[in-house]
UniProtKB/Swiss-Prot annotation:
Record: glycosylation sites: N17, N65
GO molecular function, one term: fatty acid elongase activity
Function: May be involved in the synthesis of very long chain fatty acids.
Top EC class, one word: transferase
Membrane side Cytoplasmic: residue ranges: 90-111, 171-179, 226-241, 300-365
Transmembrane segments: 69-89, 112-132, 150-170, 180-198, 205-225, 242-262, 279-299
UniProt topology in membrane: Multi-pass membrane protein
Gene Ontology CC annotations of this record: cytosol; endoplasmic reticulum membrane; nuclear membrane; nucleus
Name listed for the protein in its UniProt record: Putative fatty acid elongase 2
Location relative to the cell: Endoplasmic reticulum membrane
Enzyme Commission (EC) number: 2.3.1.199
Entry keywords, A to Z: Endoplasmic reticulum, Fatty acid biosynthesis, Fatty acid metabolism, Glycoprotein, Lipid biosynthesis, Lipid metabolism, Membrane, Transferase, Transmembrane, Transmembrane helix
Pfam families noted in UniProt: ELO
Lineage: Eukaryota, Fungi, Dikarya, Ascomycota, Taphrinomycotina
Provenance organism: Schizosaccharomyces pombe (strain 972 / ATCC 24843) (Fission yeast)
Amino acid sequence: MPDSPTLHHNHIIGLENGSLTSNNNHQGMASVSVGQFQYPIWSWLNSLADATFGKRPSSFEFIVNKTRFSSAPVVATIIISYYLLILVGGRIMRNRQPIRLQKIFQYYNLTFSIASAILALLIFEQVAPAIYKHGFFFSICNEKAWTQPLVFLYYCAYISKFLELTDTFFLVLRKKPLQFLHCYHHGATAVLVYTQIVGRTSISWLIIEINLLVHVTMYYYYYLVAKGIRVPWKKWVTRFQIVQFFADLGFIYFAVYTEVAYRLKFYKACMGHCSGHPLAAFCGLATISSYLVLFIVFYHNTYKKNAALKMKAKAAAATKGNSSESSKNADLKRLSKSNASIAEVKCNNIVTNLYPISSGLNNEK
């Protein structure tokens, strides 16, 4: 069994001639061949980026403290600023009219839905050949699965988490209520993705891929709502997110288990070494576990609790209606009896008036 590898943050794997090969300009692991697979979407992206910006994604390198947004102080500053701006923005908008921003919000959500779909396809295109050639465990645990194209795509997903912070500012400007879950989730996710890139966890592609698929659905839902379209499957968006966290935790716990068993030399009880820094694994477990709890509470309060309250209100209304109907029937009965008594008195008066002699005789007797 090989020893656990030392982490080299500046190691890059390159893509050459349709195979995954090691870049000789960097130290690190050996190459891994997946055959002559074609990567049409990746090739298209390189051509587009080259024509537009004069740079190709295939030349990207992620180096801690050198690449933009790759240092911990910068990340911390952005997240702290995000929370401070929420507080300041709320105070500024307190006595102001809400800003609608309806069209901008529509395009924003549609753009994120489409971008998430494209990024998910790009990641799948890179991972599928490795799974086909070497198996699923290789793709989530082997250090050779940490390739240059995937690093670039992870970095794109990472940057998108900072862009998604603008969700909150839309809500502030529109004077919509902000929930703790929303603000916490946005800030924590940016930090989480940062820890995974720095920690070089090979399982990252799976967690990010699932998240992107959720975002395709979620942002499309928000797009429809922003257009004023009534969407009946809102509840399923939250359910999809909860399923995502269960899946994430299942895969991460498996990876952590097999790595711990490997380090303890219980080789028969594990599938081998799982690459990545232990701190990154801990951050993943802690953060996603907190998401799962918060989303389940949100789901219960929003759907289950509200549904129970609606049922209770409906039952109370029905009981009140039945009580009102019973009271109405009782009133009708009393009125009917009263009318009958009045009719009887009138009838007696008529008889007395028609037969006064008879009445007098009766009185004399």
